[in-house]
Regions:
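Beta-strand cores of modular interaction/reader domains in eukaryotic scaffold and signaling proteins
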Residues: 17-19, 45-50, 72-74, 79
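Terminal leader/tail segments of proteins
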Residues: 52, 57, 97-119
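Thiol-based oxidoreductase modules, predominantly thioredoxin-like and allied folds used
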Residues: 40-59, 67-68
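N-terminal leader/targeting and pre-domain segments
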Residues: 1-17, 107-119
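Short Fe-S-cluster ligation motifs
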Residues: 59-69, 110-113
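Non-catalytic, surface beta->alpha helical segment in thiol-disulfide oxidoreductase systems
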Residues: 75-110
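Local sequence-structure signature of Cys/Sec-based thiol-disulfide redox active-site neighborhoods
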Residues: 7-45
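Eukaryotic intrinsically disordered and solvent-exposed regulatory patches
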Residues: 3-5, 58-61
């Protein structure tokens, strides 16, 4: 269907995509805000898709990933996870590894600061 095709094209054409409620500058839920904040703090170039703008995308992304909640982050076309998973990966250093492995530029010093503040 069209939503699935749009989602596939979006995650293929963009290195880091966050399907979220709201936008990067105006998140509409705390979970979306948390991941957007992490991506922005790490100076990552990423695309925000506001699922509130399109019910087909909102439901379509849940079907696409077989994951029931939003936000959802994709890196190089692969579903990484939602808020809890991304937060855990950030704190464990796994997110750094994921970005490094996929040649995605990010601010390593900022990532280290987040971990220091949460240790």
């Amino acid at each position: 269907d069209t939503a699935q095709a749009t989602i596939k094209e979006t995650i293929t054409d963009n290195d880091v995509v966050l399907f979220m409620k709201g936008t990067s500058s105006m998140p509409q839920c705390g979970f979306s805000s948390r991941i957007a904040g992490v991506l922005n703090f790490l100076n990552i170039s990423w695309l925000d898709i506001n699922v509130l703008d399109d019910e087909n995308i909102r439901q379509g992304i849940k079907d696409f990933s077989d994951w029931p909640t939003i936000p959802q982050m994709y890196v190089k076309g692969e579903f990484v996870g939602g808020c809890d998973i991304i937060t855990d990966m950030m704190l464990s250093g796994e997110l750094d590894t994921l970005f490094e492995t996929n040649d995605i530029k990010f601010d390593k010093a900022a990532a280290d600061k987040v971990r220091e503040a949460n240790s």
